[in-house]
């Protein structure tokens, strides 16, 4: 750390209670009051260095002059250093006191008009030559500039802006190593590698080497100015987002950051070490952080945005803040994880366990960015990313519905509205939505047959896997209409599969006749395997037909079949969720 030693005389100042006495052998003729401390000094050393004190005491007629300097920058501690400088007593100028000394010198008008190498010149030179060129010293100087009594004059003298500019320049430098004369403090977990330049050993650092320092030492107003300056220098938006994220995790307790002791209360959060954060302070900090985050898609992790959203609900942040977060999450919903999407319901009137309304708004924002025509156009150009994104979101929402479905207070309309936002054609399989529907029906046994049928409109029975079909065919909770549709489509699938195997076997027979004799054995083995597969499929089909016959024999089944099949002349097929009154025909299987 840089320092500047001034003066050569030994210590002559002594404190008695709240009074500073200067023991030089001469009777004091000046008393200066600074807050709760008084200084008994002499006119000549002070007036020869300070234009302000010269003007002040020249108007006084008393033998002993009295002055009050309660608003001097830095308070009694800084004025003591100024007084020692005037008497030529040894003092040390450091990055911690340089700013307050510079401001106090300006306040007291200690310019070159009142002696060579006066305090304004010396402190200004020290700041320019030693403090602003060093990262650590600039941080310390800026931290001291934020003191209430120092800040106004520090702003007027452009000390704050120069500190911020110096820090921003170093943060933006491509080569942020010790060549530029500033120590660095890497975030925890960051590794460094050793590199050599002309035989000189240095440490290569990552782009986030400055995150810890600015997050630890700068309050929010100064951090905002710093990050805006860095951003104006063209730094990548991803680095800006990473820095803001680091700052939030370190300074927003309810976000779940480094200070693990303590627990939130209605009034605020106490994290030990006499550190207390009111909900109002945290809410204000969170809202400012959301404004600082770059709006560019995917530069901020979806996980962090969801954590911010959850915290904003706990702190009852402004509606604008929550809407901004929901919109940004919606833009990159395909990057979200299910566990992060399970946001507890923080509303006073909330009955449900999770906030499904917020998730629905997030999904609405995502769907606004999804245009099927654009997807088709990009697919023709060989870009499958849009389709992959919405497929991932469909799987995510199916999983979310399965998690919230067991909540007895979740209304049917809410469940349907959320599930219906996903277009049917983007799901490669409907097993996920079927699982969610089954859980919901199980948790809500009071649903009527009609309501269950409406719920099943969310899935397409033709897109269920073999395992899901087997489960659905034996699921007594499903409406009978849906069970019949599942059986019908599975039977059609088996017939198609059998026909495909038979067609393949005929082709193999034709080909085997043209092959040489030594290949006939292999062809016969293939044919034997095909026949066994066909036999297995026929047995499976027969088993399903028997299950269907059992349903038909019941009274309810007869009434149901007479209702949905009617005349055999109607032969339209209806996937689950479409064509509710169209007839279904299940042809008989000949044994």
Swiss-Prot record:
PANTHER family: OS12G0117600 PROTEIN. Residues 28-95 form the BTB domain. InterPro entries: BTB/POZ_dom (IPR000210), NPH3/RPT2-like (IPR043454), NPH3_dom (IPR027356), SKP1/BTB/POZ_sf (IPR011333). May act as a substrate-specific adapter of an E3 ubiquitin-protein ligase complex (CUL3-RBX1-BTB) which mediates the ubiquitination and subsequent proteasomal degradation of target proteins. Belongs to the NPH3 family. It comes from the Eukaryota. GO terms for biological process: protein ubiquitination. The BTB/POZ domain mediates the interaction with some component of ubiquitin ligase complexes. This is Putative BTB/POZ domain-containing protein At5g13600. Keywords: Phosphoprotein, Ubl conjugation pathway. Residues 208-493 form the NPH3 domain. The modification Phosphotyrosine is found at residue 434.
């Amino acid at each position: 750390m840089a320092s500047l030693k001034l003066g050569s005389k030994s210590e002559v100042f002594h404190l008695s209670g709240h009074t500073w006495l200067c023991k030089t052998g001469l009777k004091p003729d000046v008393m200066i009051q600074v807050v709760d401390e008084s200084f008994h000094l002499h006119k000549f050393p002070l007036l020869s260095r300070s234009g302000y004190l010269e003007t002040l005491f020249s108007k006084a007629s008393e033998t002993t002059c009295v002055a009050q300097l309660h608003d001097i920058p830095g308070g009694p501690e800084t004025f003591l250093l100024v007084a020692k400088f005037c008497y030529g007593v040894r003092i040390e100028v450091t990055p911690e006191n340089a700013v307050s000394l510079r401001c106090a010198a300006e306040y007291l008008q200690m310019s070159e008009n009142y002696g060579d190498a006066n305090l304004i010149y010396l402190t200004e030179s020290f700041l320019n030559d030693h403090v602003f060129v060093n990262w650590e010293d600039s941080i310390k100087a800026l931290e001291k500039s934020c003191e209430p009594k120092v800040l106004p004059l520090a702003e007027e003298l452009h000390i704050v802006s120069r500190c911020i500019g110096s820090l921003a320049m170093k943060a933006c430098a491509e080569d942020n190593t010790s060549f530029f004369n500033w120590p660095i403090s890497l975030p925890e977990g960051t590794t460094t590698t050793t590199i050599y330049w002309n035989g000189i050993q240095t440490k290569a650092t990552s782009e986030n080497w400055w995150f810890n320092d600015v997050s630890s030492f700068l309050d929010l107003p100064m951090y905002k100015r710093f990050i805006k300056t860095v951003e104006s220098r063209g730094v990548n938006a991803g680095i800006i987002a990473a820095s803001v994220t680091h700052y939030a995790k370190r300074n927003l307790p309810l976000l779940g950051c480094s200070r693990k002791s303590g627990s939130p209360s209605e009034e605020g959060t106490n994290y030990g070490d006499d550190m207390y954060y009111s909900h109002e302070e945290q809410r204000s900090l969170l809202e400012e952080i959301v404004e600082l985050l770059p709006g560019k898609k995917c530069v901020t992790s979806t996980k962090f945005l969801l954590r911010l959203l959850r915290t904003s609900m706990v702190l009852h942040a402004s509606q604008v803040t929550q809407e901004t977060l929901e919109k940004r999450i919606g833009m990159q919903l395909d990057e979200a994880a299910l566990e992060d999407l399970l946001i507890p319901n923080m509303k006073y009137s909330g009955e449900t366990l999770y906030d499904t309304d917020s998730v629905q708004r997030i999904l609405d924002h995502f769907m606004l960015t999804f245009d099927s025509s654009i997807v088709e156009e990009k697919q023709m150009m060989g870009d499958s990313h849009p389709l992959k994104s919405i497929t991932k979101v469909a799987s995510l929402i199916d999983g979310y519905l399965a998690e919230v479905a067991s909540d007895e207070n979740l209304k049917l309309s809410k469940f349907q509205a959320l599930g219906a936002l996903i277009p049917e054609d983007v799901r490669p399989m409907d097993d996920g939505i079927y699982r969610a529907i089954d859980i919901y029906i199980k948790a809500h046994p009071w649903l009527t047959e009609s309501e269950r049928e409406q719920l099943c409109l969310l899935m397409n029975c033709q897109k269920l896997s073999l395992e899901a079909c087997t489960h659905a065919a034996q699921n007594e909770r499903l409406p009978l209409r849906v069970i019949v549709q599942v059986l019908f489509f599975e039977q059609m699938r088996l017939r198609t599969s059998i026909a495909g195997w038979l067609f393949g076997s005929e082709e193999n027979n034709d080909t085997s006749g043209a092959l040489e004799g030594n290949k006939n054995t292999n062809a016969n083995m293939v044919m034997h395997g095909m026949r066994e597969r066909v036999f297995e499929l026929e047995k499976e089909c027969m088993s399903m037909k028997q299950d269907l016959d059992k349903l038909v024999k019941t009274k309810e089944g007869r009434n149901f079949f007479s209702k949905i099949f009617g005349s055999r002349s109607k032969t339209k097929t209806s996937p689950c969720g479409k064509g509710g009154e169209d007839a279904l025909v299940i042809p008989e299987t000949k044994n």
